[in-house]
Amino acid sequence: MSSTQEASVTDLPVKRPREAEEDNNGGAMETENGGGEIKEPSCMSSIIPGWFSEISPMWPGEAHSLKVEKILFQGKSDYQDVIVFQSATYGKVLVLDGVIQLTERDECAYQEMITHLPLCSISNPKKVLVIGGGDGGVLREVARHSSVEQIDICEIDKMVVDVAKQYFPNVAVGYEDPRVNLIIGDGVAFLKNAAEGTYDAVIVDSSDPIGPAKELFEKPFFESVNRALRPGGVVCTQAESLWLHMDIIEDIVSNCRDIFKGSVNYAWTSVPTYPSGVIGFMLCSSEGPQVDFKKPVSLIDTDESSIKSHCPLKYYNAEIHSAAFCLPSFAKKVIDSKAN
């Protein structure tokens, strides 16, 4: 990875709508102050200079803003724009294609829930596959489970891995675990080639269903996941916000109910810096031993001496595990309507 690239707040360009970015072939952009051009786009607000504003057609008519103290890194990989900045209130922030992926302050709520909701729902998981998750946070959490013998991670963008290791060492610490096998490549292709019944659990830590992550929300991908799971194996995938994306969630639930013949459930957690402040997960099991996702059956290894460089859990516990499946009435009505 290239050396640290720093820029002043006022040198950053105004955010374009995401569709415009997809049509752009990496050309230069005009900066806010009109002083020259740089190639890396950002989401700095043109209304309030010095603030990052997350703007996307995925959540029209609204934006979430964070005050920027310093830009730590700007880069463009083969797949997406990557930015790291120091915020005034949430620590360091990782942004991919203009969308916040994690902040030091609240990443625990996402990483812990997407990992422990599935892994604590089955007994003694041994082989785990992570699709995406290049920042390493899911790896950190999987490593808390002493029964796990093999952790494969397939991340398409090596720049994300390198940036996480440099700027988010407490998140990327998972890469230090000897059980981890990193594959830089396309998760869709990797799963197509995976042997049937290989994994006890698959965790899909994807970004929004736009650009390189789009295929991770489509039916053929879920079919590949189901084939790669052992009987009664589980999958947990990022499944958008119930406040913003019920149409997307409805499609995901419908696809999952068609494919996974075990349990199919939707859960959610609170992440302040994600759009609407919440993010959801689809949890499904393959045909075989019944899985009740709402009742955790496995405990997390809390012996910190056996977990290299791990801090204690900050968000997950058994009570919040069960509570995560309690849905507001409007969401429950839509999701239940897709029941077979």
Curated annotation (Swiss-Prot):
It is an enzyme of class 2 (transferase). Putrescine binds at residues 110, 205-208, 274. It catalyses: S-adenosyl 3-(methylsulfanyl)propylamine + putrescine = S-methyl-5'-thioadenosine + spermidine + H(+). Heterodimer. Component of a multiprotein complex. Interacts with SPMS and SPDSYN1. Transmembrane segments: none annotated. Pathway: Amine and polyamine biosynthesis; spermidine biosynthesis; spermidine from putrescine: step 1/1. This is Spermidine synthase 2. GO terms for biological process: spermidine biosynthetic process. Its EC number is 2.5.1.16. GO terms for molecular function: spermidine synthase activity. S-adenosyl 3-(methylsulfanyl)propylamine binds at residues 80, 111, 135, 155, 186-187, 205. The gene is SPDSYN2. InterPro entries: PABS, PABS_CS, SAM-dependent_MTases_sf, Spermi_synthase, Spermi_synthase_euk, Spermidine_synt_N, Spermidine_synt_N_sf. It comes from Arabidopsis thaliana (Mouse-ear cress). Belongs to the spermidine/spermine synthase family. Residues 49-286 form the PABS domain. The active site is at residue 205.
